[in-house]
Structures are given as structure tokens and as C-alpha cells.
């Protein structure tokens, strides 16, 4: 609250106090009139005491407000004095700054230094302009360049002549190379025709005859098996008649070896088909030679396989003839056979074609059953 507001408030309070005094004077006049009219003033005693109490309270309130107002005025005077001191200090600092700004000796020295540097730069630009003019004059002298261009043109002409000669020689070499390629292509075609003829002859005559022999051998083995069964039944009947009912010997005939041999023979004669490896014209000579060597190796394997089949057939016939002489054998694995660990059957050898019927190879067979797994009877030792 400002001083003006406080003064206006005090003025309003004084006016209210004057109005109260006027009202009190009017009330006193009225009271005096009433006293004259009414001698009994006992009812007004309490009103007078109340009015006095109110007037004392009003005086106390004005006194307290006067003290508070005096304290506020003192505080305002103190703050004004502090601001005056701050303004005086700022005026001193401002005067010092103005004095320093009015001292332009450093600025004049910097201007002199700048003028000196500008003069040096102007001199450097003049020197550069002179050097540039000299360089331009030197660059305009193209006599050496023209001489070098003439020499380069001469070299290009000579190189062009050499390239023309080389192109002629290269064309002749290319024609000769084409002739050699055509000759080799014809040779490859003749080899392919001969190979096709050989393959047709091999598969149409030799392989078919081998398959016919195998089928005949299988039929012969079937006849042997039927004869063995007939002999076994006759011998069993003879044993029952000889020993009497229920007194037949406990020996049991063994036909597993014969059946195993037949099964092994039937399994091992499966010959995988030979895929057509003849390439069209245009293949290189090395691939043709590799195909011929591969077919030769296949033929050698087939011939060795046929010889092995004939040998196994002879051995089976001999073993069957021995079994006719002696029908009762001990229940043991033959020493000249080896067991396949996949199907459990016994064969004279575990071969690649047999393992292919189990979707396996010899390498995979050894990985699954061990490197020492026997593939032939000799391996068991």
C-alpha cells in the first residue's frame, strides 16, 4: 500500500470520526432534550458506557494504525536510502567505463597495424600480377607442344602398321585353329558313333545273355530245392518207419545255407542300369576319352562279376551235392560265409550291389558297424 493510499484512508477515517462526533453531538443534544423531558436517565447509563467503550476501542485502533504506518514509512525511507547508494555506485562504475571508452589509443594502434598489412598485401598482389603475366606469356609459347604432337602422330602411324601386320597373322592362325577344331569335332563324332555301337552290342547281346544265364541258374536252383525237399520228406518218412512213431532222432536238417546261397545269388546279380553318358557334338576330346575309359571299366567290372557269379554257382552246386550225401548238419554258421548285419542273412561276400538293396554303400556300412566289420570270410580271422 502506497503513502497516498494510506493518507486517503486516514482522511476517510477522520471524516468518519467527524461524522461520529457530529452524530455524538446530535445525540448529546437529543439526550439533553430527553433529560429535560424525562428525568429518569437510568436507561441511558448503559448506552453511555457502551459508547465510551467503543470510543476507547476506536482510539486504540487509530493509535495502533499510526504506529504501523510510522514503521512502514521508516522501512520505505530505508529502502530509498539503499537504492540511492546503489545508484551512486553504478554512477561511479559508469563514469570509469566512459573514461576507458574515451581512451582510443589502442584502436588507433590497431588501425595503423591494419594499414601496414594492407600495404604489404597490395605489394604482394602486384608481384603476383607480374609473375602471372610472365607465366601467361610462357604458356602461349606452344612450339614444344606442337613438336611433341608431331612425334606422337609418327609413333601412332608406326604402331598402326604393326597392328595391321599382327592382325593378318592372327587371322591366318584363327583359320588354322578352326580347321583343327573341325577335324577334332569329326574325330569326336566318329568316337561317339563307335561308342554307341559298342554300347548297343554290349547291352543287347552280352548283358542279355548274362541275364538269361542267371534266370536259368535260378530255375535250376529251384529244381534243386524241390529235389532237396523231396529227399528230406523221404528221409523223414524212413526215419519214422525205422525208429517207430515218436522215436525219431532229434537231429534237424538244415537248408538255411542253401536258401542263403540262393538268396545271396539272387541279390548280387542285380545290375544297376548304365546311364547314357554320350554327349552331343561339340564336347572336348578329354571328356570323350573319359567316357570311353569309364565304359571300359564298367565292362571289366561286369565281366569280373559274371565270372564271380559262375564261380559262386559252381560252389553252390558242389555244396548242394554234399548236402545230398549228408542231410543232417549242426546248427552253425558256415566258415566260408559272412553275415550281413543289415538283413541278418549269410553271403559269401558283402558286396556293393547287395548293400545298394539296403540303400547303403560300403563306406556307410563301415561307418555304421565299424571299420573292422567283415566283408569276406577271410576278414573274420
Curated annotation (Swiss-Prot):
Residue segments, region 7 X approximate tandem repeats: 22-274
UniProt keyword Repeat, yes or no: yes
Keywords linked to the UniProt accession: Gas vesicle, Repeat
Intervals holding Sequence repeats: 22-59, 60-84, 85-122, 123-160, 161-192, 193-232, 233-274
Region (Disordered): 261-333
Biological process per Gene Ontology, one example term: regulation of DNA-templated transcription
InterPro entries noted in UniProt: Gas-vesicle_GvpC_halobac, ROS/MUCR_sf, ROS_MUCR
Subcellular location: Gas vesicle
The family this protein is said to belong to: Belongs to the halobacterial gas vesicle GvpC family.
Other noteworthy facts: Encoded in a 14-gene locus called mc-vac.
Name of the featured protein: Gas vesicle protein C
Amino acid at each position: 500500500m502506497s503513502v497516498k493510499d494510506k493518507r486517503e484512508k486516514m482522511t476517510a477515517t477522520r471524516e468518519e470520526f467527524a461524522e461520529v462526533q457530529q452524530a455524538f453531538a446530535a445525540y448529546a443534544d437529543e439526550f439533553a432534550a430527553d433529560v429535560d423531558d424525562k428525568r429518569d436517565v437510568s436507561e441511558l447509563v448503559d448506552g453511555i458506557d457502551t459508547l465510551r467503550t467503543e470510543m476507547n476501542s476506536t482510539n486504540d485502533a487509530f493509535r495502533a494504525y499510526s504506529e504501523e504506518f510510522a514503521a512502514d514509512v521508516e522501512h520505505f525511507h530505508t529502502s530509498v536510502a539503499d537504492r540511492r547508494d546503489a545508484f551512486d555506485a553504478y554512477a561511479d562504475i559508469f563514469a570509469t567505463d566512459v573514461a576507458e571508452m574515451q581512451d582510443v589509443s589502442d584502436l588507433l594502434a590497431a588501425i595503423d597495424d591494419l594499414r601496414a598489412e594492407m600495404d604489404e598485401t597490395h605489394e604482394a598482389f602486384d608481384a603476383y600480377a607480374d609473375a602471372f603475366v610472365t607465366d601467361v606469356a610462357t604458356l602461349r609459347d606452344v612450339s614444344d607442344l606442337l613438336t611433341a604432337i608431331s612425334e606422337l602422330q609418327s609413333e601412332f602411324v608406326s604402331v598402326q602398321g604393326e597392328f595391321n601386320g599382327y592382325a593378318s597373322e592372327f587371322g591366318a592362325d584363327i583359320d588354322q585353329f578352326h580347321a583343327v577344331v573341325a577335324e577334332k569335332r569329326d574325330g569326336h563324332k566318329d568316337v561317339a558313333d563307335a561308342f554307341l555301337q559298342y554300347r548297343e552290342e554290349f547291352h543287347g547281346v552280352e548283358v542279355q545273355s548274362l541275364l538269361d544265364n542267371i534266370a536259368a541258374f535260378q530255375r535250376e536252383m529251384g529244381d534243386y530245392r524241390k529235389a532237396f525237399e523231396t529227399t528230406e520228406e523221404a528221409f523223414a518218412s524212413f526215419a519214422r518207419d525205422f525208429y517207430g512213431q515218436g522215436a525219431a532222432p532229434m537231429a534237424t536238417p538244415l537248408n538255411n545255407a542253401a536258401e542263403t546261397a540262393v538268396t545271396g545269388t539272387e541279390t548280387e546279380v542285380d545290375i544297376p542300369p548304365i546311364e547314357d553318358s554320350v554327349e552331343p557334338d561339340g564336347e572336348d576330346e578329354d571328356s570323350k576319352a573319359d567316357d570311353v575309359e569309364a565304359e571300359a571299366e564298367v565292362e571289366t567290372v561286369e565281366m569280373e562279376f559274371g565270372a564271380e557269379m559262375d564261380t559262386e554257382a559252381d560252389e553252390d552246386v558242389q555244396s548242394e551235392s554234399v548236402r545230398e550225401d549228408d542231410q543232417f548238419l549242426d546248427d552253425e554258421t558256415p566258415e566260408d560265409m559272412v553275415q550281413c548285419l543289415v538283413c541278418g542273412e549269410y553271403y559269401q561276400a558283402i558286396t556293393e550291389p547287395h548293400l545298394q538293396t539296403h540303400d547303403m554303400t560300403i563306406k556307410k556300412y563301415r561307418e555304421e558297424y565299424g571299420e573292422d566289420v567283415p566283408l569276406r570270410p577271410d576278414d573274420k580271422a
